Every structure is written in C-alpha cells, then in structure tokens.
Amino acid sequence: MEQAKVFFTDFRCHPGVNQQQKLEKLLLAAGMDTIDFEGKIVAIKLHFGEVGNLAYLRPNYAKTVADFVKARGGRPFLTDCNTLYIGSRKNALEHMDAAYLNGFSPFSTGCHVIIADGLRGGDDVEVPVVGGEYVKYAKIGRALMDADIVISLTHFKGHEQAGYGGALKNLGMGGGSRAGKMEMHAKGKPHVITSKCVGC
C-alpha cells in the first residue's frame, strides 16, 4: 500500500489570514478541488464531542469544509455514529443535542447533522472485510454507506489503547454502528496465559 501524503498547516495567523482560510488552502493542496462534488451527497464524518468537553474540532472548521463542498455543487451533511458507552452520544436524540450544544447546528455550519446509525444505533450496513483477521463483516452506519462521498474531518489525540487516534479511528471505529463497535471491542478481551500466570 502506498504511504499516505500528509499535509500540514500551523495555527499561526496574521492580519488578513485566518485559520479557516488556511484550511481551505490545505483542502486545495490535498487535491480536493479535483473531486467531482456536483450533485453528490457528501458525508463529513467528524466527532461532535461530549457535552462539557472541548476535545473536538470547532464547528467553524466543519463550516469551511461544508462551504468548500457546496461551492462545487455538493450537498454536505455532518455525521457520526452513536457510542457504546454512557454519555451524551449514545442515541441520536442526545447525540444531536450534544452536537448542537457544541455548536454544530445547520445555522453555524451551513449543513444538517445526521446521526449515521439512526435513533438507537441499529441502522447499519454489513460490509465484508476482505482478509479481516478480527472482523469478517463491519457494521457501518447506513448514512455513511448511503453517501456518495465521505470526508473524514479529524482531530489528532492520544488514545489509551492505540497510542493515538486520528483519521483511521474516526472512520474505522467512529463509522461503526453501535453493534459494529460492540463487535470490534469484543475482540479486545484480555485472556490469561495460564502457563505464565503467577496469580498476582
């Protein structure tokens, strides 16, 4: 597999140049202007954040990407799948409340929020994972599968199991329905190698 190209911009701004303009330059440098968005439904997959948390990309970045897509004839929407754990994103009603409270509304971003795996996280599509060692079929949120184009808008963060999380986790785990997340997490159960166990 070919290595991915990584495009970088810093947060330093000066009069006349803001972070949203820098993001648009980044989208152009990455070649996103070569994508045929005309008439296409475009899922912008991101993490809306838990209520009271600030560890998510700000809505103005989502607006920049949505405006970029709309300027090229696309029809964007913001999306994520429900979570397994107890929190403010475990069902679509609470998830949308969290999105709106954290600033991701149609008024601030210029596009709608659709929870990809439905009201209770059961609206999914089984996708075969060719050569999958741990998962043979991935259960992906239906709205992601129904979109013509998917854009991953991701923040980079530390992760307790993987070391760090980013674009792969945003799509791989974040794109999974609640049932899909359950299957992925179930494979990570600890097991005891009895011959090496010291009974600690």
PLM feature segments, named:
Residues M1-C200:
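N-terminal and secondary-structure boundary signal
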